[in-house]
């Protein structure tokens, strides 16, 4: 009797949380499915801004890339510069007005500009992360992800077969079944198959939406009396990078006179992210701190790889495909859940009408 009451309570919780989060879950799942293949879509639609012809010479300095962008647009306020380990990839220069300048790293030529407020993939990403509602949207997405975690766990409880003999039926969509049964199978069985990938998605999603972990902010020492030079960016880069195979290198530009130079190096890996970050005084280029991937615990590296796990790219193309299919199936769950509920509601109404006095 207690087991039945518990099951009924969890079923009610599952139902109402589904009502609360269903529409948002639908939007987030569809956009998430698209973002699983973000790189492939960009390579097709933005190839000329992402790739250049590799040359047998060193890449240009950070200082020269900054000068090229400021010559192209004197009003550009640069926030970061990004190089890639792939010799055929263009460098990227980010600015405060949410634009990304594609620059040939061998010639300093500006190839073009992407506006993050108009670019299709950036709009999909913004919808996925904020629902186009800014900080309020970020909060909604965070709490919706927490709700979805409860939905997943309660759904697994409701799916779990009471007897071993029922297991095969619980993992199979019955053929030639009634419409009502088909809706139930599409919801219950499909939900079971996406449970594991969606657990990874929701746990990493919650961590990303919460902002992850951040180290205390360092400051540059303005009182040293040393004038700042643009070449300091390259000095910081040379102290940090010594020719190892990398996926990308990001140099963060100070926001003001007290801010620091940041250098973040993401090394090549086929597993959890290997990323080391260095912080330098912008005037003396004196090292202020470092956060090396070798010193991180498994948990730190796991959550440091949030994005790779969240999108499936940690397992390459197969991982992306799994997350894409899981996202599409997840998008269907609020729909099939509503159809199941609506079918029961209609049945109750029909029963009440047939049982009413003439």
What is the role of each PLM region?
Residues 1-358:
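Conserved histidines in hydrophobic membrane contexts and catalytic metal-binding motifs
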């Amino acid at each position: 009797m207690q087991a039945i009451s518990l099951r009924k309570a969890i079923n009610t919780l599952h139902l109402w949380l589904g009502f609360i989060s269903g529409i948002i879950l639908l939007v987030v799942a569809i956009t998430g499915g698209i973002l699983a293949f973000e790189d492939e879509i960009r390579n097709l639609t933005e190839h000329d801004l992402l790739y250049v012809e590799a040359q047998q010479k060193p890449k240009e300095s950070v200082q020269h890339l900054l000068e090229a962008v400021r010559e192209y647009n004197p009003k550009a306020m640069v926030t970061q510069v990004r190089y890639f380990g792939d010799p055929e990839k263009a460098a990227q220069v980010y600015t405060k007005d949410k634009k990304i300048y594609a620059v040939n790293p061998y010639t300093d030529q500006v190839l073009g500009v992407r506006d993050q407020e108009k670019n299709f993939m950036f709009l999909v990403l913004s919808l996925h992360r904020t629902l186009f509602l800014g900080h309020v949207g970020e909060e909604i997405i965070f709490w919706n992800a927490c709700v979805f975690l409860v939905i997943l766990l309660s759904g697994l409880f409701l799916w779990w077969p009471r007897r071993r003999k029922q297991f095969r039926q619980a993992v199979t969509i019955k053929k030639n079944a009634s419409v009502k049964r088909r809706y139930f199978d599409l919801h219950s069985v499909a939900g079971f198959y996406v449970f594991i990938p969606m657990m990874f998605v929701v746990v990493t999603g919650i961590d990303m939406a919460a902002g992850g972990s951040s180290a205390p902010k360092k400051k540059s020492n303005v009182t040293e009396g040393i004038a700042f030079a643009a070449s300091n960016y390259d000095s910081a880069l040379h102290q940090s990078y010594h020719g190892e195979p990398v996926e990308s290198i990001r140099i963060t530009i100070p926001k003001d006179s007290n801010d620091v130079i940041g250098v973040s190096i993401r090394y090549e890996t086929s597993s959890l992210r290997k990323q080391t970050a260095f912080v330098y005084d912008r005037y003396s280029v004196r090292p202020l701190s470092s956060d090396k991937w070798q010193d991180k615990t498994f948990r730190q590296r796991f959550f440091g790889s949030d994005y790779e796990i969240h999108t499936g790219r940690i397992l390459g193309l197969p991982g992306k495909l799994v997350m894409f299919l899981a996202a599409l199936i997840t998008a269907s769950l609020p729909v099939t859940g509503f159809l199941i509920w609506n079918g029961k509601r209609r049945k109750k109404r029909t029963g009440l009408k047939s049982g009413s006095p003439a």
